[in-house]
Amino acid sequence: MSARPGLLARAEARLTREWQRRGALAWALAPFACAFGAIAALRRAAYARGWKARVDCGVPVVVVGNVTVGGTGKTPTVIALVDALRAAGFTPGVVSRGYGAKIAAPTAVTAASPPQQAGDEPLLIARRTLAPVWVCPDRVAAVRALKVAHPEVDVVVSDDGLQHYRLARAVEIVVFDHRLGGNGFLLPAGPLREPLSRRRDATLVNDPYSRALPPWPDTFALSLAPGDAWHLDRPSRRKPLAQFAGERVLAAAGIGAPERFFATLRAAGVAPATRALPDHYAFATNPFVDDHFDAILITEKDAVKLGTSWRDARIWVVPVEAALDPRLIALVVEKLRGRTSA
């Protein structure tokens, strides 16, 4: 296996660690963070004061995003929110930028879409929810195209896009993991895209260590729990994680916060060797061909990039389910219904 994926992952991990403290590197980059913050504040002000117009696409939009760099659990949150909205009587659709997707115009994503076209997260959302999913770097164009193709959709969930201010939205949900805002600095000195004080309608904190929630308004715990693993070659074959306990197991993840996946497996009684791959790793070739393990556990997000041509009988996929606080669902539904009746 090439050393490049490992080097990239280690570089990402080191930068993430640096962003958790105010060390020499953070202070050296602080002037650039000030410049970044000024530009970001000017962009926000341009839309807040009407210098630039927000676009209302004729359907309420719920944005699920973050103010930090890296994975926080947005994708399972979007999947759970789509299911909750459907249960509440809505007909939801989803839009996404489609990170890594090779598209310039609005494109529909179905369960059969190639990951190179759709992007890994939109493809996973389409497969898990069976809701209409459209991707485009221009989210306004994506919402409009979705609405034309599916006029029955009465609410759109935007997977990320918090900083896509041009798109008018009815509800904003910001997702954090246990690191919260790190050292509190903006990019590149810290992990923040926007200040922690940024206005939003609700905050979710995905903290597997079950610490006290920060004292922010309308803040709720986000719980992610693994399900039974399914076999990559034979998806109908299921195996509880506890049954991997006596095997030689490698856990590999090409996601924004791979350590969270590894911690989930350890909590389930699995003691794997671990390999962090770069976020959105393409899996152009099998990186496990020279590894000697009984089983290899990967995430669902990575699994969508492994097509039927993969024939590695050791690979199992670990699904993750998000449990949303009923109070969050009630808050979102109330805002949506209030907007509809207004």
Curated annotation (Swiss-Prot):
Pathway: Glycolipid biosynthesis; lipid IV(A) biosynthesis; lipid IV(A) from (3R)-3-hydroxytetradecanoyl-[acyl-carrier-protein] and UDP-N-acetyl-alpha-D-glucosamine: step 6/6. Disulfide bonds: none annotated. InterPro entries: LpxK, P-loop_NTPase. It catalyses: a lipid A disaccharide + ATP = a lipid IVA + ADP + H(+). ATP binds at T68, V69, G70, G71, T72, G73, K74, T75. The keyword Transmembrane does not apply. It holds the Pfam family LpxK. Its EC number is 2.7.1.130. Belongs to the LpxK family. Transfers the gamma-phosphate of ATP to the 4'-position of a tetraacyldisaccharide 1-phosphate intermediate (termed DS-1-P) to form tetraacyldisaccharide 1,4'-bis-phosphate (lipid IVA). PANTHER family: TETRAACYLDISACCHARIDE 4'-KINASE, TETRAACYLDISACCHARIDE 4'-KINASE, MITOCHONDRIAL-RELATED. This is Tetraacyldisaccharide 4'-kinase. It comes from Burkholderia pseudomallei (strain 1710b).
